[in-house]
Amino acid sequence: MPSSFDLLGEMIGLLQTEQLTSSWACPLPNALTKRQDLWRALINQRPALPLSKDYLNLEDAYLDDWRASFVPVSVKDCQKTNYTSLFLYHGDIRYLAVDAIVNAANSELLGCFIPNHGCIDNAIHTFAGSRLRLACQAIMTEQGRKEAIGQAKLTSAYHLPASYIIHTVGPRITKGHHVSPIRADLLARCYRSSLDLAVKAGLTSLAFCSISTGEFGFPKKEAAQIAIKTVLKWQAEHPESKTLTIIFNTFTSEDKALYDTYLQKENNCE
C-alpha cells in the first residue's frame, strides 16, 4: 500500500499534467506538509470537471488514510446543554460522525477555489473529496441559477465521518455595518431550511457551524443569538422532530463562550 507521501506525489503529478490550475508548474516538494499544501492548492483551484479513475482511486486511498488518522466525534462526546436535544461541540466539524453537518457555502455551491484557504467551505470540500464538487456541480446545472441565500441542499459527505452535508448560503455583512432585519431573517432562514431538509431526509443528528460568521462577516454575538432562537422556535413548531439531535459546532473561543452562555437557560439570548 503506497504511503500518503507517495499518494500525494502521484495525485500532484496527474493534476499538474492537466494544466488546469495556476499551480500546475510547481516542482514536487520533498516534505510531506509541502506536498499536502500543493495537492490542496491544485484540487481547490480545479474546475468542476470529470476526473480520471486513476486520480479518484489515489484520492480515495489518501483520504481513507486521513480518515483513519483520527477518532471521529459522536453525539455522546459532545457537551450537554440545558436542552435535552441541543449539544455543543468545540473543534473541527470535519471530525463529527453525525447524520449531517452544515456547510457555510457560497452562491456557486462548488466550494472554495482559493488555494489552501482557511474557510470551512474549503476544508469540507477538500477532505470530503473531489466527488463533492462534482455532485454540487450537478445540482447547480439542474437548478440553472446561483443558490439563493437561506436555502439548503443535501449531498453525500463522501470521505468525512458524517453521512451527509447540508449546504446553505448565509447573508454577508459589510464590516462596520449593522445587522438589518432582512439579513437577520436571511440567517434564520438558513437554519430553518437546514432543519426542514434534515427532517425531510429522515436524519436524526445535525451539526451546525456558525453560519456567516467567517468570511461573510456576520457579527458573532448576533449570529449566535439568531441561531439558538431560530432552532428553539423551530423545535417548538415541530414537536414531531424531537428525535432530531442538534449540535452547535464552535471553532473559535469567542463562539464557544457565546454559545456556552446562551444555552445555560431558556430564553437567555437577548
Curated annotation (Swiss-Prot):
The keyword Metal-binding applies. SUPFAM superfamilies: Macro domain-like. It is an enzyme of class 3 (hydrolase). ADP-D-ribose binds at residues 92-93, 106, 119-121, 212-216. One of its GO terms (molecular function) is hydrolase activity, acting on glycosyl bonds. Zn(2+) binds at residues 112, 117, 119. Gene3D superfamilies: Leucine Aminopeptidase, subunit E, domain 1 (3.40.220.10). InterPro entries: Macro_dom (IPR002589), Macro_dom-like (IPR043472). Its EC number is 3.2.1.-. The keyword Nucleotide-binding does not apply. Its cofactor is Zn(2+). Binds 1 Zn(2+) ion per subunit. Residues 73-267 form the Macro domain. This is Protein-ADP-ribose hydrolase.
